[in-house]
Swiss-Prot record:
Underlying gene: SNF4
Major place of residence: nucleus
Domain spans labelled CBS: 165-227, 260-324, 350-408, 432-487
Signal peptide: none
Family listed: Belongs to the 5'-AMP-activated protein kinase gamma subunit family.
Natural source organism: Arabidopsis thaliana (Mouse-ear cress)
PROSITE patterns recorded: CBS
Residue positions, PTM N-acetylmethionine: M1
Name this protein carries in UniProt: Sucrose nonfermenting 4-like protein
Subunit: Subunit of a probable heterotrimeric complex consisting of an alpha catalytic (KIN10 or KIN11) subunit, and a beta (KINB) and a gamma (KING or SNF4) non-catalytic regulatory subunits. Interacts with KIN10, KIN11, KINB1, KINB2, KINB3, HSPRO1 and HSPRO2. Interacts with BZIP63. Interacts with FLZ2, FLZ8 and FLZ13.
TM segment ranges: none
Domain comment as written in the entry: Kinase-interacting sequence (KIS) is required for interaction with KIN10 or KIN11.
Length: 487
């Protein structure tokens, strides 16, 4: 029932006279194969854990431990995990759980006998003395460590250029600004890309970017003029006409009072990565075109790449992968640093509340919330606030499947139905095939979060409670860079 019992003394307890304490370790969060490893196994042995009879999601094992402090971690289905509901610390090896086994007249430094008495756990008549979870288990980040880490990241980004973000091979799609909106809509869907730069043949230059927010605003605008969206309405609007209309809606005018579309935010291949990141953050865009011209007047520009925060973060992770100790903040749990947006009951208060959706909410209300909250995605939760899915701006392109935009009313379709439509849609290329919800725990280290966000197509991580998947917060690429750059 409990699996094999491990003796941490390795047979030396009799000679040393040390008392061994049977200690039960429990992993209550499920899995197929679960192992335990720790300082008491010299981190070289993985002890198999057995499912609890009648409760296959709970794994346990008993180990005989010597008195003193021990560190341990769980190896669950090929991934190292720790239990955030037990005492844990952060170190060079990542986040590990800790346990203190008392011997005769032993009291851990910083704890009174009364404190230890309160932290006893009665398990099958085996008393386990552990550090009190209410005590500060996570080391505080010093201001010196923070500034040192930010300085080193700033130096790295200031000495690397956008040219280093260019892939060895690939393609970048640009759209003619005179294309009908409907055709552009279908191209983005069929190619599986969220956005594309706009080319104006008359001016001989790139003039903007078309992305998911444009389609959200278009569908909401057209939806106010009738009960259904028609292909004819989308067919009569070119991208150029839409951009001009968008400027009018946003009250962007030139000196003559004419609508003036927002100028293109772009970078050159030799701009440093810090400037590229700042342009993305300051202009609140998902990516910026990397454009090169060999002529001083900028004529005959060449579109090389779309630079994103994900690519820059991948550069940071790659550079510091084997020297993480030079960035003290990397091993900090995300719950201990001012990063992301959290629900009010978790972490520090935030001036920006965390938006969530219920699956039965209308698609129209979801799109309105995306625009009003100025976010790129919203977690979809059940009545217990547990994560079900996530609705993102880029999901709007799923309405191009079978011309669904011409057959639905935004206030009649639910978020659940829209997500189902997106799952049924299978564009031949692109990033939309694969895992939708990317999650992390509040106890995960910053470096673990950064490495996940550096993967292509991952723009945010939803922070969930272990086991229940109750949403605790969300961390975006923008959040990480604002923290790393001290903005």
């Amino acid at each position: 029932m409990f699996g094999s019992t491990l003796d941490s003394s390795r047979g030396n307890s009799a000679a040393s006279g040390q008392l061994l304490t049977p200690t039960r370790f429990v992993w209550p969060y499920g899995g197929r194969r679960v192992f335990l490893s720790g300082s008491f196994t010299r981190w070289t042995e993985h002890v198999p854990m057995s499912p609890l009879e009648g409760c296959p999601t709970v794994f346990q094992v008993i180990c005989n431990l010597t008195p003193g402090y021990h560190q341990y971690k769980f190896f669950v289905d090929g991934e190292w995990r720790h239990d955030e509901h037990q005492p844990f610390v952060s170190g060079n090896g990542g986040v590990v759980n800790t346990i203190f086994i008392t011997g005769p007249d032993m009291v851990p430094a910083g704890f009174s006998p009364e404190t230890l008495g309160r932290s006893n756990m009665d398990v099958d008549d085996v008393f386990l003395r552990t550090a009190d979870p209410s005590q500060e288990a996570v080391p505080r980040m010093s201001g010196v460590d923070l500034e040192l880490s930010r300085h080193r990241i700033s130096v790295l980004l200031s000495t690397r250029t956008a040219y280093e973000l260019l892939p060895e091979s690939g393609k970048v799609i640009a759209l003619d600004v005179n294309l009908p909106v409907k055709q552009a809509f279908h191209i983005l869907y069929e190619q599986g890309i969220p956005l594309a730069p706009l080319w104006d043949f008359g001016k001989g230059q790139f003039v903007g970017v078309l992305g998911p927010l444009d389609f959200i605003l278009i569908l909401r605008e057209l939806g106010t003029h009738g009960s259904n969206l028609t292909e004819e309405e989308l067919e009569t609007h070119t991208i150029a006409a839409w951009k001009e209309g968008k400027a009018h809606i946003s009250r962007q005018y030139d000196g003559s009072g004419r609508p003036y579309p927002r100028p293109l935010v772009q970078v050159g291949p030799y701009d440093n990565l810090k400037d590229v990141a700042l342009k993305i953050l300051q202009n609140k865009v998902a990516a910026v075109p990397v454009i090169y011209s060999s002529l001083q007047d900028g004529s005959y520009p060449q579109l090389l790449h779309l630079a994103s925060l994900s690519g820059i973060l991948k550069c940071i992770c790659r550079y510091f992968r084997h020297s993480s100790s030079s960035l003290p903040i990397l091993q900090q749990p995300i719950c201990s640093i001012p990063l992301g947006t959290w629900v009010p009951r978790i972490g520090e208060s935030s001036s920006k509340p965390l938006a969530t959706l219920r699956p039965h909410a209308s698609l129209g209300s979801a799109l309105a919330l995306l625009v009003q909250a100025e976010v790129s995605s919203i977690p979809v939760v059940d009545d217990n606030d547990s994560l079900i899915d996530i609705y993102s701006r880029s999901d709007i392109t799923a309405l191009a499947k079978d011309k669904a935009y011409a057959q639905i009313h935004l206030d009649d379709m639910t978020v659940h139905q829209a997500l189902q439509l997106g799952q049924d849609a299978s564009p031949p290329y692109g990033i939309f095939n694969g895992q939708r919800c990317h999650m992390c725990l509040r106890s995960d280290s910053l470096v673990k979060v950064m490495e996940r966000l550096a993967n292509p197509g991952v723009r945010r991580l939803v922070i969930v409670e272990a086991g229940s998947k109750r949403v605790e917060g969300i961390i975006s690429l923008s959040d990480v860079f604002q923290f790393l750059l001290g903005l």
